[in-house]
């Protein structure tokens, strides 16, 4: 990434006093010290987040779990468009260890990131595992990790896909702000979600009629020009 002019910052979680909990600042909930608020500011200032973890007993480490929990503790924050604060950012993960579990760890980490609002590009995970049992770690001399063709290929593809998608989102101004704004939903807007109060046919025992654009689209046909997907952005007034 640095060779492409990207500013890269590495942060080792165990070097910081990150309190356990799911509030933005755990000093407000009994902890004497919590470095997370400052770390969170750095995370929110980045367009790309790559979470790295070793494998322990086939799972991501407890430290990695703690970091994800603290990320989740900030998931209530909104951006200027009323979307969740992590929108418009991309995420990936790197996993190392001496036992199987790279894909299992990546599955959990990438799911967690997308649930928070991150966009996950194709092949956004890479990893390396040594021989089964005790042995050298990735950076230890003679591990073979830095020379592994499979690991290097996946790391390269992940890097470029993160860069491509981050650039696409940056150029587009992030994820379009329609149908995904928590602030608007809380204000009563429903973005064309059917209001049960108007489903009078179903109350009489007949199935509710589908909107015209759904009925005429067909299972795989193109959207009609008057479908919501083809209209310009709009927000309904609260009713």
Q: How should these model regions be labeled?
A:
Residues 1-81, 143-226, 231-239:
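N-terminal beta1-alpha1-beta2 submodule of the flavodoxin-like/Rossmannoid cofactor-binding fold
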Residues 20-24, 106, 134-136:
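Short aromatic-enriched loop/helix-cap "lid" or pocket-rim segments at secondary-structure transitions
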Residues 80-131, 150-153:
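Short, glycine-/small-residue-rich phosphate/pyrophosphate-handling segment
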Residues 96-99, 139-143:
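Phosphate-binding/catalytic loops
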